Amino acid sequence: MTGTPKTQEGAKDLEVDMNKTEVTPRLWTTCRDGEVLLRLSKHGPGHETPMTIPEFFRESVNRFGTYPALASKNGKKWEILNFNQYYEACRKAAKSLIKLGLERFHGVGILGFNSAEWFITAVGAILAGGLCVGIYATNSAEVCQYVITHAKVNILLVENDQQLQKILSIPQSSLEPLKAIIQYRLPMKKNNNLYSWDDFMELGRSIPDTQLEQVIESQKANQCAVLIYTSGTTGIPKGVMLSHDNITWIAGAVTKDFKLTDKHETVVSYLPLSHIAAQMMDIWVPIKIGALTYFAQADALKGTLVSTLKEVKPTVFIGVPQIWEKIHEMVKKNSAKSMGLKKKAFVWARNIGFKVNSKKMLGKYNTPVSYRMAKTLVFSKVKTSLGLDHCHSFISGTAPLNQETAEFFLSLDIPIGELYGLSESSGPHTISNQNNYRLLSCGKILTGCKNMLFQQNKDGIGEICLWGRHIFMGYLESETETTEAIDDEGWLHSGDLGQLDGLGFLYVTGHIKEILITAGGENVPPIPVETLVKKKIPIISNAMLVGDKLKFLSMLLTLKCEMNQMSGEPLDKLNFEAINFCRGLGSQASTVTEIVKQQDPLVYKAIQQGINAVNQEAMNNAQRIEKWVILEKDFSIYGGELGPMMKLKRHFVAQKYKKQIDHMYH
């Protein structure tokens, strides 16, 4: 649906909603205690009865009470809470938050790695009439201070002493709304208004059930429940206000479109919960369907994730592209150790897997005997080695997945479905599922939502605009930014560019703010160029196109290297794939330093050949890469070039490597 008529239809749909309210609310608000007009459809998907989060949770507890909900590892043993226990713990936490002085529509901040305590505090905050405010564990003290004051955080949950010290380093006068801090991991040092988790959970004993019920009953589906702070890759983080209805409606929509089954799903929680994608798939969807959530170890992103996957065998797995790329590299490394028949079988199976799954993607379900053999001999073993042998939904989100990785997994019978969404759309807006996906597409629009491509060019590329029950309430205390995002007819303008094919599959081509405009006035979207560079030159880990307002395009390149498993810092040593690339050229280099300091002629020549191949596919001379430089370290969360969800922070990179960029232009 790419035309504007849908705008009018969407606007008419609103007439059915909130008709009991004396003053009809608007589609947006910037007030923490504000109410919005819900975007209910007249009938069908999108017309479901609005629910508050307490109603939503209570309904699930009635259906799944004794089923396992949360699993936390204590030593070698998994400790399980069922849905009854989970709900009671949330009520207990809510009473304690009230006792500590949580005010209505004020924040409860959560700073730490995923855990049962994170979930219980998040839900408890909402039951108690506050707002759940996730804070990235990687945030600086300055960003934490901004979020705490902006969200009016009354109570803060921190994981450990390291996070506590970060907060204590902030002058107390700059943390005015904060009344108490709870720490949920030992050891713990004594401090004023600091509580251990166990002590905190006992604080609310004197609060009667009736008092909590009054707060719960006073809540409305069109009021704010969750604040998601954008990671601030381009400036000050914005507080995205999500209503009860945003959360409860989209949890149901995702469940239906992913074809998830009640009481049968298992997920592993490891991505930062302050990001809406992780929060939706780890907290809210499992409540909706009675799924079991296992908590990964805190060092999951540094190497232990696959061990957890092998132990718990999730049925649904969501990863960001860099996670899938790491797993891709691991499988390739292991397969390279195979010899003789085993190696031949792997190549044979991949060829069959790619052909069969490519046809399946187009709706042709032909499974020859050779495919069934490949499944038994190779695919099942690869999946078992990754802990994905029970998994039916393989998902990638937050950034585009590169083609090589997508095709590699497709050939191994692991079709990765990409999704597209924003914090402002409460998570996914389009999804791919096992029966409905295309390589490099973000899938189709969620049932009950609407899409519009605004100001399309001759190629059908336009700004992706969104409509539905999942559209956020507004940015907290920021009317200007809210009205820039939501137009007069209620469409959310994403700032992302995309196109739709004839079947309704969405392809995201870039971001309006990321488009480079050269000194000659040429518009160049960087992502397609960067993706092609990584495809043509296998030793390249990250590529960032530079050239805004400059006379030609240049590129920052990083090489694939090993990572420090404890800190996540990129090491100097090249990884397995990069070393293989070098040996194939006849280079004996084993470190980034050897290649960069000596300007290894074999590697530099191969990179230039790759750049030449990319330039041959350029639409015109203005889109050609004229110069490039290899940086001494790969991009990472540790170095600040990547955000918490491993998204490239272009503005930060441009500042950090200004000297190298300037050198290419002077």
UniProtKB/Swiss-Prot annotation:
EC number(s) stated in the UniProt entry for this protein: 6.2.1.3, 6.2.1.15
Residues of the signal peptide: none
Class of enzymatic activity (EC top level): ligase
Catalysed reactions, semicolon-separated: a long-chain fatty acid + ATP + CoA = a long-chain fatty acyl-CoA + AMP + diphosphate; (5Z,8Z,11Z,14Z)-eicosatetraenoate + ATP + CoA = (5Z,8Z,11Z,14Z)-eicosatetraenoyl-CoA + AMP + diphosphate; hexadecanoate + ATP + CoA = hexadecanoyl-CoA + AMP + diphosphate; (9Z)-octadecenoate + ATP + CoA = (9Z)-octadecenoyl-CoA + AMP + diphosphate
Subcellular location: Cytoplasm; Membrane
Membrane topology, as annotated: Peripheral membrane protein
GO molecular-function term, one example from the UniProt record: arachidonate-CoA ligase activity
GO BP: any one term: cell differentiation
Major localisation: cytoplasm
PROSITE patterns assigned: AMP_BINDING
Mutagenesis or variant effect for H511R: Results in a shift of the pH optimum to a more acidic pH without affecting substrate specificity
Expressing tissues: Testis-specific.
Chain residues that bind ATP: 230-238, 418-423, 496, 624
Record keywords, A-Z: ATP-binding, Cytoplasm, Developmental protein, Differentiation, Fatty acid metabolism, Ligase, Lipid metabolism, Membrane, Nucleotide-binding, Spermatogenesis
Role noted for this protein: Catalyzes the conversion of fatty acids such as long chain and very long-chain fatty acids to their active form acyl-CoAs for both synthesis of cellular lipids, and degradation via beta-oxidation. Can activate diverse saturated, monosaturated and polyunsaturated fatty acids. Has increased ability to activate oleic and linoleic acid. May play a role in spermatogenesis.
Family: Belongs to the ATP-dependent AMP-binding enzyme family. Bubblegum subfamily.
PANTHER family linked: ACYL-COA SYNTHETASE BUBBLEGUM FAMILY MEMBER 2-RELATED, LONG-CHAIN-FATTY-ACID--COA LIGASE
Name of the protein in question: Long-chain-fatty-acid--CoA ligase ACSBG2
Species: Homo sapiens
Phylogenetic lineage: Eukaryota, Metazoa, Chordata, Craniata, Vertebrata
Gene: ACSBG2
